[in-house]
Structures are given as C-alpha cells and as structure tokens.
Design a protein with these regions (language model features):
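Anion-binding alpha/beta catalytic cores of soluble intermediary-metabolism enzymes, centered on
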Residues: 2, 85-147
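Short beta-strand segments enriched in small/hydrophobic residues
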Residues: 26-35
C-alpha cells in the first residue's frame, strides 16, 4: 500500500475548514522567517495555499539575517495572531531553541516550544500533537494499523521527528527502539525484525529494501537533496517489500502541513473554553 499523502492532507484540510467555519472569523497564523532563500519562499507559498484551504490566513514576517534573538522574541511576545510558527532552520548565529521556547502554549501549533513539548510528552489531553506525529497517526489509521504490541524502530532522535514519534508510539503500546548516529552501524540488525519503521534522519536513502522485513510498515519522514531532487531516508525500492510505504515527496510532508493547520483549529477552538 503506497500512501497518498496529498489525498489524506486534502481530507484533513477540508475537515479543518468545516470546524473553523463555526468561529465566524478567519484565524491568522504568523510565520516568522529569517533571511529566506528561494526554497524557503517556495515552502511558505505552499503553507499559505494550505492555510487558505483550511480557511485561514498565513501572515509572513520576514527578517534579515542581522535580526537578533531579542527582536524575534519581542515579535512573538507581542503577537496577537492565533498561532505562531517559526520557519526553520534559523541562521546559525541565532539560538533557535531560545526563540521557539518563547512561543506561548496557546499559540504553538508546531509544538516546538518547551511548554508545548512538555505538555505533549506528559500526555496532556488539552495539547495538540506535533504535526509529524499527527501525520504518522493518520497514516496508520488510513492503513487500519494499531501499533500496540508491535516492534517499532524510530531512526533519528531529533525533536522534530524522532523524539516525539518515539514518545507517541510508546504511549500507543509499541515496543520502541531509537536508532541514532552512534548506532548507525547496527541499523540493519535493528531493522531486521521491525514491524514499523519511522525515519527522520535526513540521510538520503539510508534504508534499503534488504534491511527491512517483508510486510513492514515504512514511514519516511526524512528529507534531503540528492542530485537536485528531494529524496527520503528510504530507498524507493523499499516499497517492494513493505505492506505500507510513504513516498518522498508526497507522503508524510503534505499530511504534516495539514496537521499543522488542524492544530491551529484545535488551539483556536480551545481558547474560549479556558483551557489556557
């Protein structure tokens, strides 16, 4: 089964638009970007289009690379928009973690600030899922897969993919092993018996079809560039042995963006309830 990420994303955005229609106003999402290049601008254009599909507006605040952390944090502190996202990566001179940690819980649709990450990790029902976790959840649901009791390997331990996905799978009853750079040489052995593999290493074609077992569920959340093309962590030939496979592009990416805007709806609709 090859997952059609665009189809799932379209369904999520349509449901989100329906939920938002009860508000009587159009939610606004602030996107902060520093020294955006052509690729960043292209990605922001896609996010803007998806925001429109979800019944929202994406307002982009562009800053030069001379901007300071204090200036970005001041913009976050004064933000009246419904949600705030910071387009990563930030220039190396800036402490991305400090900037992200300034985002209030009630506006953190990406779940990248400390307050939102801690709330998610604690299992707080009143917080939203990180978008990639939401994408993994939608993919498993679309394939009628319950991870409970399964052996899962998460490749990469970053806070965008690996850490939150591993946490979520454990909470769903899977036995989870995390592969990092130190264990890369042992990766074939780690993957050999895995029922589910979720990769977010950002290492082009790191995983080949001879490393995974027949019928494994393979979710590729890693992206990198190879030969001028966007590729995933998994060689496309992995689809030949997988029972479920997400291609790159067109798999996890579109679903994660849709989940981002579903999170905005979650935050906006929760605000009147006094949760925050």
């Amino acid at each position: 089964m090859i997952i059609d990420g665009k189809k799932i994303a379209t369904e999520i955005l349509a449901k989100t638009r329906m939920r938002i229609s009860t508000l009587g106003r159009t939610p606004v999402v602030l996107a902060i970007t520093v020294a955006p290049n052509a690729a960043t601008e292209s990605y922001l254009k896609i996010k803007s289009a998806r925001a429109h599909e979800a019944g929202m507006i994406l307002a982009v605040a562009r800053y030069p690379d001379s901007v300071t952390e204090e200036e970005l944090i001041a913009r976050i502190d004064s933000a009246t928009e419904d949600a705030i996202i910071v387009q990563l990566p930030l220039p190396a001179a800036l402490d991305a973690k400090r900037v992200l940690d300034a985002i209030p819980l009630k506006q953190d649709a990406d779940v990248l600030g400390k307050l939102a990450r801690d709330a998610f990790a604690s299992g707080d029902a009143n917080t939203c899922m990180p978008p990639v976790v939401g994408a993994v959840a939608h993919i498993l649901t679309s394939a009628s897969v319950d991870p409970r009791g399964m052996r899962a390997v998460v490749v990469g331990e970053g806070w965008l993919v690996g850490n939150p996905v591993a946490s979520w799978l454990r909470a769903r009853g899977a036995t989870v092993t995390v592969a990092n750079q130190e264990s890369e040489s042992m990766l074939p052995e780690m993957l050999a018996d895995a029922d589910v593999v979720v990769s977010g290493a950002g290492h082009a074609r790191l995983i080949t079809n001879d490393m995974v077992k027949e019928g494994a569920i393979l979710i590729d959340a890693g992206t990198s560039e190879s030969g001028g093309q966007l590729v995933g962590d998994m060689d496309p030939r992995c689809a030949e042995v997988a029972s479920v496979f997400t291609p790159v592009p067109g798999g996890v990416g579109p679903i994660a963006v849709a989940c981002l805007f579903a999170n905005v709806a979650w935050l906006v609709l929760l605000k009147p309830s006094g949760v925050y």
